[in-house]
């Protein structure tokens, strides 16, 4: 009979790595966990590093475009390379892969722009735009973050998204200002809890939301949620166009 016992010498051994890379990874992990831009001191504490040590690593991470530093606030946030890596991960998700061909066909059929948005650190974030024949006179691009309150996309996330995730997004958006698509320089009074709940219940019942001439005058949109097999919100599909070119009727061709 053969002896199948594994000796200590035969056990898998941990591979050697580069410690400095792993320390830098702690800073990236801290940014991902906090889901908002962080100042040097807060980021260092979250990564369990001294501020001097964190600063040294952040210089290199910034050079690699894994993080970027806001010139005004001095806060650090994920950089362009992190965004590209994140997009690669998103593109492999079943819900995204299933929705992308539909978005492209829809843009071609209706002649309007179609955006796909996923949960991000600051809020719903555009990860893909399919452009139609009609020009879109609004500054939206991959990486644009949508307001949770003033955009159809944001309200769909409020209606169907994970509550803990939404709370983190809302906290991040509270001080984001014009970093958001849909930011209002003269904000409207927030609806009371009852009115907001009624609004979200109506969105859930319809399964679709719209915005008309808001937050950008002359631009309207219709948005639907996309779920995974377990019924969890994965992304939102939003048709956007000039108010003259888009039919925002609940029973119109786009809603259908």
List each language-model region with its residue ranges.
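Amphipathic alpha-helical effector-binding/dimerization core
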Residues: 72-175
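Short, structured helix-loop boundary elements
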Residues: 17-21, 40, 75, 79, ...
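Short, solvent-exposed recognition segments
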Residues: 3-4, 135-215
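A structural signal for short hydrophobic beta-strand segments in well-ordered beta-sheet cores
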Residues: 67-69, 116-117, 226
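Short glycine-/small-residue motifs
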Residues: 66, 126, 235-236
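N-terminal helix-turn-helix
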Residues: 2-92, 96
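Extended hydrophobic
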Residues: 182, 186-256
